[in-house]
Curated annotation (Swiss-Prot):
Name this polypeptide is given: S-ribosylhomocysteine lyase
Gene that this sequence comes from: luxS
One of the GO BP terms on file: quorum sensing
Taxon lineage: Bacteria, Bacillati, Bacillota, Tissierellia, Tissierellales
Known function: Involved in the synthesis of autoinducer 2 (AI-2) which is secreted by bacteria and is used to communicate both the cell density and the metabolic potential of the environment. The regulation of gene expression in response to changes in cell density is called quorum sensing. Catalyzes the transformation of S-ribosylhomocysteine (RHC) to homocysteine (HC) and 4,5-dihydroxy-2,3-pentadione (DPD).
Binding site for Fe cation: 53, 57, 122
Organism expressing this protein natively: Finegoldia magna (strain ATCC 29328 / DSM 20472 / WAL 2508) (Peptostreptococcus magnus)
GO molecular function annotation: iron ion binding; S-ribosylhomocysteine lyase activity
Family: Belongs to the LuxS family.
Quaternary structure, from the entry: Homodimer.
Length: 156
């Protein structure tokens, strides 16, 4: 089997940031998949499922309310070091920096019940940690608010 593109990224050099993971074509539409990397792989602890789950619910709610039909998907990476965001359109990392700032500011300032945090709405509603979601959101904002080229383009 051929190695898929995401496994060709040097995770030993990968830093937290916003990266274009891939672009797919569906008819005349371009779908851009972004790698929203929150922790440095293999060098920082991964996020626990509870904070990942809270960020997923808050992030999906925020993005779908803000961008509506432009959002195809927002969800966690299996390695728990970040999230994938798939948007309609041929986009670059730089194009969504302000959006990602707004998203993680929303999460870091969020108070109240997490959207969809009920047995009726979610298959694992009790596994959410808003405090840690805020912690990781603030950590990520430190990177995004001082974004550099190495946080926008995958390392060689």
């Amino acid at each position: 089997m051929n190695k898929i593109e995401s496994f060709k990224i040097n995770h030993l050099k990968l830093m937290p940031g916003i990266y274009v993971s891939r672009k797919d074509y569906l008819g005349n539409e371009v779908l851009t998949t972004f790698d929203l990397r929150i922790t440095a792989p293999n060098r920082e602890p991964v996020m626990n499922t509870a904070e990942v789950h809270a960020i997923e619910h808050l992030g999906a709610t925020f993005l779908r309310n803000k961008l509506e039909n432009e959002v195809i998907y927002f969800g966690p990476m299996g390695c728990r070091t970040g999230f994938y965001l798939i948007l309609v359109g041929d986009k670059k990392s730089e194009d969504i920096v302000d959006l990602i700032k707004e998203l993680f500011e929303f999460i870091s300032n969020y108070e109240g019940e997490i959207p969809g945090q009920s047995a009726k709405d979610c298959g694992n509603y009790s596994d959410m940690n808003l405090s840690m979601a805020k912690f990781y959101s603030n950590k990520y904002l430190n990177v995004i608010n001082n974004i550099k080229k190495e946080n926008l383009i995958y390392p060689e």
